[in-house]
């Protein structure tokens, strides 16, 4: 069973609610999900998951401190061991929603592979945001099935339109 880490920082509860929806989407798609508040996340958590969903509220156009602290603590223990691991971020905000850029920048430092655009939610998650967050979880669960697995060669007689015999 694939594992998805949902790690977040929430001040008003909106990001926690968003994290719960992402987790529900991944669980519904068959993944085992570990939602954690940034201050409770352990530096080795990224090593123990197949995909990650970092999320934060807007903290002056930057990610919240608990998420940043977690990423700081996790960097050296995971360096070189999470390259190309799938991730997709989510953010909540009151108007601008620029904190997603800071999460994306640090994900690049970790060399993670973004598999979906950041879901940006203004205020409390409403109907469309809930659908987008749930889809983010589903996407993460699906990505974990293929991460690190090269295409499988299939032995069959090639057809005219399948000269390589590679299954996806």
Name every feature range the model reports, one short phrase each:
Residues 2-4, 14-17, 21-29, 34-41, ...:
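FMN-binding flavodoxin-like domain, especially the glycine-rich phosphate-binding loop
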Residues 9-13:
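Short polar catalytic/cofactor-binding loops
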